[in-house]
C-alpha cells in the first residue's frame, strides 16, 4: 500500500466519527429546547421515555462511530477478521438506513404524502437539518474505505510476519 493510501486509510475511520457529530448535536439541541422545527419534538422532549430514546440513540451512534476509529489503530493480527465481519454487518445496516432515507426524500420531493421530519420546518430550519444530517449520509462510504484499509493493513502485517 502506497504512502498516500496509508494516510487516507488512517483518516477514514476518524471521518466516520466526525460525520455523526452534527446529527448528534442537532438532536441534543432539540432536547435542550432549541427550535429545530422538528414536527415530533414534543414526543421526545415531553416524555421521559422519548428523552431516553434520543439519548440512547446518541450513545449507540457515537459508540458505533468510535468503533470505526478502532479500525485505524487495532492490533490486526490479534482479532483477525472479526472487525471486518462486525464492521461489514454494521455497514450493511448503514447502507439500508441511508437507502430508506433517500427513498423517503425522493418520494417527498415528488409530492408524495410520506412522513418526514421537515413538515413544520421553515427554510432556515431545513438548512440546519441538511447541515446536521448531510455528513451522516457519507458514513457508509467512509466505513467501506476504512474496512478496506483495515484489510489491506492486515494483509501487509500478515505478509510481514510470514517473511520474517
Question: Where are the predicted features?
Answer:
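Membrane-interface helix-boundary signature
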Residues: 2-16, 47-53, 76-86, 125-131
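C-terminal TM-helix exit segments that contain a strictly Trp-centered aromatic cap at the helix terminus
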Residues: 22-34, 93-110
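Hydrophobic alpha-helical transmembrane segments
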Residues: 51-62, 123-144
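Cytosolic juxtamembrane helix at the C-terminal end of the final transmembrane segment
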Residues: 2-5, 72-79, 141-164
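Interfacial non-cytosolic loop connecting adjacent transmembrane helices
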Residues: 37-48, 100-130
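Hydrophobic transmembrane helix segments
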Residues: 21-55
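Core segments of alpha-helical transmembrane spans in multipass integral membrane proteins
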Residues: 49-72, 92
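Transmembrane alpha-helical segments of multi-pass membrane proteins
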Residues: 14-20, 81-99, 164
Amino acid at each position: 500500500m502506497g504512502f498516500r493510501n496509508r494516510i487516507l486509510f488512517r483518516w477514514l475511520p476518524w471521518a466516520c466519527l466526525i460525520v455523526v457529530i452534527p446529527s448528534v448535536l442537532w438532536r441534543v439541541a432539540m432536547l435542550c429546547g432549541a427550535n429545530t422545527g422538528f414536527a415530533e419534538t414534543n414526543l421526545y422532549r415531553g416524555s421521559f421515555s422519548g428523552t431516553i430514546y434520543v439519548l440512547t440513540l446518541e450513545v449507540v451512534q457515537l459508540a458505533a462511530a468510535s468503533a470505526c476509529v478502532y479500525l485505524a489503530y487495532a492490533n490486526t493480527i490479534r482479532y483477525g477478521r472479526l472487525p471486518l465481519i462486525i464492521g461489514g454487518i454494521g455497514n450493511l445496516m448503514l447502507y439500508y438506513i441511508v437507502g430508506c432515507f433517500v427513498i423517503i426524500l425522493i418520494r417527498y420531493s415528488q409530492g408524495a404524502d410520506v412522513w418526514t421530519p421537515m413538515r413544520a420546518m421553515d427554510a432556515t430550519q431545513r438548512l440546519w437539518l441538511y447541515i446536521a444530517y448531510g455528513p451522516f449520509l457519507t458514513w457508509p462510504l467512509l466505513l467501506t474505505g476504512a474496512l478496506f484499509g483495515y484489510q489491506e493493513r492486515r494483509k501487509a502485517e500478515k505478509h510481514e510476519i510470514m517473511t520474517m
